[in-house]
Curated annotation (Swiss-Prot):
Listed name of the protein: Thioredoxin domain-containing protein 12
SUPFAM superfamilies according to UniProt: Thioredoxin-like (SSF52833)
Tissue specificity annotation: Ubiquitously expressed. Expressed in stomach, spleen, intestine, gill, heart, head kidney and skin, with the highest levels in liver, brain, muscle and kidney.
Keyword hit for Iron: no
Location of this chain's protein in the cell: Endoplasmic reticulum lumen
Top EC class of this enzyme: oxidoreductase
Keywords: Disulfide bond, Endoplasmic reticulum, Host-virus interaction, Oxidoreductase, Redox-active center, Signal
Motif annotated as Prevents secretion from ER, chain positions: 170-173
Coiled-coil stretches: none
Cited function: Protein-disulfide reductase of the endoplasmic reticulum that promotes disulfide bond formation in client proteins through its thiol-disulfide oxidase activity. May function as an important antioxidant, and may be involved in the responses to viral infection.
Cystine pairings recorded for this chain: C67-C70
Induction: (Microbial infection) Up-regulated to the highest level in liver 24 hours post Singapore grouper iridovirus (SGIV) infection. 8.2-fold induction after 4 hours of SGIV injection and the expression increases up to 42.3-fold at 24 hours post-injection, decreasing to 11.1-fold at 48 hours post-injection.
Organism phylogeny: Eukaryota, Metazoa, Chordata, Craniata, Vertebrata
């Protein structure tokens, strides 16, 4: 009898532990990781699928938990109402630490952090969309909300709607 009870307790404990582990993974994927929990963040794979299905461009942030520049950008980004509003026009992807893709397309001018890249709905990185008001040696480094907003507006203009479709209709032929 005691063995059965011990097995039930052990089995129940394992179920709870497994559930908590799965729940934590879901929460971490949805978490803003300091960049704003009010924004609907996706993983890279889910974000690419959603962008392709919805036709929305992707805004992708690559950062590290230990990075001072990343920590400085987080509250500026998270507190910006305009970034939050513009985020509705993008599939927002937030990659931290080991989530950073190894593909060179995601580090067009180096592997510094944080980097913000814009991708079209097919998942292609558009390296021409850069921080025009930043350091030309670090084209994808944004240090404040105004720079991010400017990049988002440029990406929205270049990667959505009829202008984007007209420039890329020949790509499919």
């Amino acid at each position: 009898m005691q063995t059965s009870l011990a097995n039930i307790v052990l089995f129940s404990s394992l179920q709870v532990l497994l559930s908590l582990t799965c729940f934590q993974e879901v929460v971490e994927a949805a978490s803003g990781k300091g960049f704003g929990d009010n924004i609907h963040w996706r993983t890279l794979d889910d974000g690419k699928k959603e962008a392709e299905a919805s036709g929305l461009p992707i805004m992708l942030i690559i950062h590290k938990s230990w990075c001072g520049a990343c920590k400085a950008l987080k509250p500026k980004f998270a507190e910006s109402k305009e970034i939050s509003e513009l985020a509705h026009n993008f599939v927002m992807i937030n990659l931290e630490d080991e989530e950073e893709p190894k593909d060179d397309a995601f580090s067009p001018d180096g592997g510094y952090i944080p980097r913000i890249l814009f991708l079209d709905p097919s998942g292609k990185v558009h390296p021409e969309i850069t921080n025009k008001n930043g350091n030309p040696n670090y084209k994808y480094f944004y240090s404040n909300a105004e720079q991010v907003i400017s990049g988002m507006k440029e990406a929205q203009e270049k990667l959505t709607g009829d202008a984007f479709k007209q420039r890329h209709t020949g790509d499919e032929l």
